[in-house]
Amino acid sequence: FEAEFSVILVRGQDGEIRFWDSTRNSHDHGILATSSLPAGEAIAAQVDRARELARQVADALRYVGVLTLEFFATRDGPVFNEMAPRVHNSGHWTIEGAATSQFENHIRAVAGLPLGDTATVAGSVTMTNIIGADILQTEQWLGQPDTHLHDYGKAEVRDGRKMGHV
């Protein structure tokens, strides 16, 4: 495969579906390291088909809330990888990077409220997971412009453990 990407949607109680832009996901030792926009041409060429597949799943399940499906971009089109019936780590960029975050839209959907705008609010966005002892370098993260630190407040630092994201 050429790349992995996420399709994140929110479906309301009335069946309305909205999608956030799809991110290119990079992994390190099997753990999501980054989710980035723009995702690149290989992914952009496959997003419409992947969204249609995601829409079919959400509608068939009569799902309400945020649903994430991950795909591999291949020469033959998108290949399904996994599904998360919830807000997802690859969508944490929406907190500051979208008009309405995946968290807010999830609550809106399950509460029967109108869904919010999912538009990306910047030309490029990257969410980077902070893994293990990297959380001890918060000054490095906070010193960068347009960076927002999310420390999960976990008491124990362990190798391979997601401690936060920026």
Roles of regions detected by a PLM:
Residues 48-69, 85-133:
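Active-site "cap" helix and flanking loop/linker of ATP-utilizing ligase/carboxylase catalytic domains
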Residues 1-69, 73-75:
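Internal nucleotide-binding/catalytic subdomain
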Residues 108-165:
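Peripheral (often C-terminal) accessory segments that flank ATP-dependent C-N-forming ligase machineries
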Residues 5, 32-35, 81-82, 131-133, ...:
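Short, well-ordered secondary-structure micro-motifs
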Residues 7, 106, 166:
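Residue-level signal for inorganic ion chemistry
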Residues 74-76, 96-97:
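Contiguous C-terminal substrate-recognition/catalytic subdomains in enzyme active sites
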Residues 77-87:
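A short beta-strand motif that forms the metal-chelation/ATP-contact edge
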